[in-house]
Amino acid sequence: MELEYESKRPLYIPHAGPILLEFPLLNKGSAFSLEERDNFNLQGLLPDTVETIEEQAERAWRQYQDFRTNIDRHIYLRNIQDTNETLFYRLLAAHLAEMLPIIYTPTVGDACERFSDIYRRARGVFISYNNCDKIEDMLQNATKQNVKVIVVTDGERILGLGDQGIGGMGIPIGKLSLYTACGGISPAYTLPVVLDAGTNNQQLLNDPLYMGWRHPRITGEQYDKFVDAFIQAVKRRWPNVLLQFEDFAQKNATPLLNRYRSELCCFNDDIQGTAAVTLGCLLAASRAAGKRLRDQKVVFLGAGSAGCGIAEQITAEMRTEGLSEDEARRRVLMVDRFGLLTDKLANLLDFQSRLVQPSDSLSDWQLDSDTISLQDVVRNARPTVLIGVSGQPGLFTEEIIRDMHQHCERPIVMPLSNPTSRVEATPEDLLRWTDGAALVATGSPFAPVQFEGKTYPIAQCNNAYIFPGIGLGVLASGAGQITDAMLIAASRALADCSPLANGDGGALLPDINDIQSVSRVIAMAVAKAAQVHGVALVTSEETLSLAIEHNFWQPQYRDYRRTSF
């Protein structure tokens, strides 16, 4: 049970003078009091006026508004983060809906592609295969000692952009910013890490300013040993840490998760987080449409690790509603670039083979060729839910959506591919093609749609609704693992927060400005599930609630007292 918190008591620190101003976690800038300026040798190093954090945030907001491009806004916010983290999170708290797409998707994709060009200051730990014998030392060198949450990537599959090498570091930095802004986890407890296993991106290898290891990606046994060396070093350094795998290639993501999820508290947000938030959104949409999940027929476009992870979560929840495993799997169909996954297809990956449809069940389908397209599936299977995780734009065509709407009064359509340029269909088109009947959730942010005099808010099926609450629940409960039951509990808790499902109108998911409240609800559900399933000590609900609040950091300055090393 984790009851420690960044308390309101004075903080005793040994740093002073210019060195103190260089610590983002400790720096207050112009908000240092007159007494602190005397005690910490800051006189003359700051303007005369002592400001409040509200005044600092107002200045930062005005400066932010002067920037004309999202990438420049991203760079500006990252500069504040690297200068004064408390101010950074106070600014985010005041303008979360505006700034969330800037610090994370979709703008973070541009930042990853241009990482070496826009690099200003080091943050986190860069572990190169070239120096893999020094991993222990690298973790010891981390400026944060009491790390509780690590987000790690190898940069091979960054969003829909592919191999970005060490540019992938932008993802752990952004993800951990959301752990704090949305889930209240103190930035003092978080650490972004990139495993630099080389890159196969020739453009990066040819770039004279690329800052990573200039070498083709290592694979096979070399790669496995590299990742394992990192995991074992983390276990020795921080044995109770929560480790999140982020943007690993499909061929590595699931094997790494399966290998290590019982060895330390870890999860893969691309697989499990995406699945949890999608299931939560689908549960909410099903309630809004007046159906149980078990009665839906779901078609996926995209059968990678993310799509299959979502499908597994959906079938698991269908089973809790009374379906057998075979019945649940018959109601979830997977389509990839080779067509519908059936037992006749060769060379399927392990996680795909569990989701194939038996060929004999398709004997009455009207087909023109051996390859069963998305159009064929929609016409023959008559789905009520269509989920896109293909990374390919425009594949939910007008013909497909209109065919779906012919047999489904309120189709649920979720084009989840990121960034916006890769979305399978826009919300405006989906609503127009269904005469406003579609229940829509997207992976990227979209403005509300005006259709025939009515405003339709568009839910962003953003993992930020889920993983911060999961992290908070793990820390508060002291869970040693993240189980499937904990993830399903998170999905149900998110659905319970849906304005539309609760009959209040609006979007399928809560307003992003309410995300801290949502994270608390999810944290409680996750912590309870951890206790029920034996991966956390059993305590009262009151104790859990207290632990969640004690772990919920707020961006406020603490009083400082001088001490010696």
Swiss-Prot record:
Active site, UniProt feature: Y104 (proton donor), K175 (proton acceptor)
Binding site for NAD(+): R157, D270, N418
EC code(s) of this entry: 1.1.1.38
Cofactor field: Mg(2+); Mn(2+)
Feature type site, description Important for activity: D270
GO molecular function: malate dehydrogenase (decarboxylating) (NAD+) activity; metal ion binding; NAD binding; oxaloacetate decarboxylase activity
PROSITE patterns on file: MALIC_ENZYMES
Keywords: Metal-binding, NAD, Oxidoreductase
GO BP terms in the entry: malate metabolic process
Catalytic activity: (S)-malate + NAD(+) = pyruvate + CO2 + NADH; oxaloacetate + H(+) = pyruvate + CO2
SUPFAM superfamilies recorded: Aminoacid dehydrogenase-like, N-terminal domain, NAD(P)-binding Rossmann-fold domains
Any one Gene Ontology cellular component term annotated for this protein: cytosol
Binding positions for a divalent metal cation per the UniProt entry: E246, D247, D270
SMART domains, sorted: malic, Malic_M
Textual note on the cofactor: Divalent metal cations. Prefers magnesium or manganese.
Superkingdom of origin organism: Bacteria
InterPro entries tied to this protein: Aminoacid_DH-like_N_sf, Malic_enzyme_CS, Malic_N_dom, Malic_N_dom_sf, Malic_NAD-bd, Malic_OxRdtase, NAD(P)-bd_dom_sf, NAD_malic_enz_proteobac
Enzyme class: oxidoreductase
Subunit structure of this chain's protein: Homotetramer.
Homology family: Belongs to the malic enzymes family.
Name under which the protein is recorded: NAD-dependent malic enzyme
Native source organism of the sequence: Sodalis glossinidius (strain morsitans)
